[in-house]
Amino acid sequence: MNHCLVVSHKKLQTFRTFAASKFSSFTKSAQKSIKYSFQFIYQNNPLFVHVAYFALISFAGYGSLKVLKPRDKSNTLKDLDVLFTSVSASTVSSMATVEMEDFSSAQLWVLTILMLIGGEVFTSMLGIHFMRAEFGTKESVSTRDHSPCIDIESITSTKFGPSTQGTKVTVSFSELRMENGGHVEPKTIKFLGFVVMGYLLITNLGGSLLIYLYLNLVPSAHKILKRKGIGIIVFSVFTAISSVGNCGFTPVNENMIIFQKNSILLLLILPQILAGNTLFAPCLRLMVWSLEKITGKKDCRYILEYPKAIGYKHLMSTRESVYLTLTVVSLIILQTVLFLSLEWSSVALDGMSNYQKIVSALFQSVNARHAGESVTDLSNLSSAILVLYTIMMYLPGYTSFLPRHDGEDSKTEKINKRKGLLENWIFSHMSYLAIFVMLICITERDSMATDPLNFNVFSILFEVVSAYGNVGFSVGYSCKRLLNHDARCKDASYGFAGKWSDNGKAILIIVMLFGRLKTFNMKGGRAWKLR
């Protein structure tokens, strides 16, 4: 009897070991299958991956915002407005249909996370992670039997020129390697990933600390937040991440208008905005250059010498970085000069000192590309400035005047001609904007008929371009502009879109997503010839 029990026990133990090994083997196989399947989809249809990513975080944010209670528990937010806000934060658009002070501290933290993981720097860091996964089983790119084309928002070769506006060209790593005369080691990509992560941490934590210190040292700014019941830590972290991510949200209803006389605070935020978008590439190159001087690492030297070989679009040559910086600075100066020339004695800058006016003009000019924070009521600005801002919001972040040398059109522009032909038949950005404006004019036609001063074509165009550029500027809605006075009308601090119908808001959600993914259509519409 005992012998039978011993034999049964041994058989059971053997079966357990066998089952455990098979289960472990199955788990590893499943993980590899999922990994390689995802890599295959990512390489062949990265647009699908990006759409899925932003849809996932947007709906996750929507669910979190719905579960958490707003500040005023009796004020129930509409489902569409909550989804709109979640998409707006995820796509760093800062378009608003509800007042920010309606959200509780817990909900503000959710929006902070959405702005962080939806920002350009963070998503580009994810791109580097997938690039590392692609090289995980190889010693280096040069030893690969084939070099797949990776068409991803951050892993692209970007050509700059007077007519390209940062045209994205999909190229294989082998072609990049031949063009640049080197090869990429996996450890170099890993190092770059750590550099971008460090950049993200330094800008966000450093920005939060600077804002926190200012609010503690300046009683007038501290009193504003105390009066509104907003914690300093929440405001500091939220505003810093929003600024670096170029989202444009702030925890207060008035955005930065309430701090328009706190010029030092505005000047502290300006570098964060530039470092997170239009000057990210030059700042990243400066960081790599500094690390090379301090550590002498070969990886830094390689990245500086062959930025295109990495395949990370935010890595630029010295020449490209200089021209991009000059373009950004020139556009800021142009906007600031025009703003001060036209608005110096206007209502928008009323009550400010000369110094505060200059800082406010500079702040507005920087935010037009593409952060969206504001220190003035845009509805009080002249039409010329609003047209200027519309143009600035339309321009891509890396728009640069870069004179092209003879022979600069290299092999990369000849690759994937078949795909380029398909892209030519896709509508251009201007075509999409025209379609979206027409659709919203249709959904809001009743309001345009009864309230033409608020619901006019330019206001709708301004709102659509702002959403498509992921900026967040809005001319707002004013009860004073009603033709027939309505005692029930109440002015609100949120954007003009907050007064739109549900259909109009739904279309604007699509516009924000289109705008966040517009880098996949930088060459669209070339088949259309106007003669």
Curated annotation (Swiss-Prot):
Weakly expressed. In roots, expressed in epidermis, exodermis, cortex, and sieve elements and companion cells of phloem. In mature leaves, expressed in large highly vacuolated cells of the adaxial epidermis, phloem and xylem. One of its GO terms (biological process) is sodium ion transmembrane transport. It is found in: Endoplasmic reticulum membrane; Golgi apparatus membrane. GO terms for molecular function: monoatomic cation transmembrane transporter activity; sodium ion transmembrane transporter activity. The keyword RNA-binding does not apply. HKT transporters are proposed to contain 4 pore-forming regions enclosed by transmembrane segments with each containing a potassium channel-like selectivity filter motif. This is Cation transporter HKT1;3. It comes from Oryza sativa subsp. japonica.
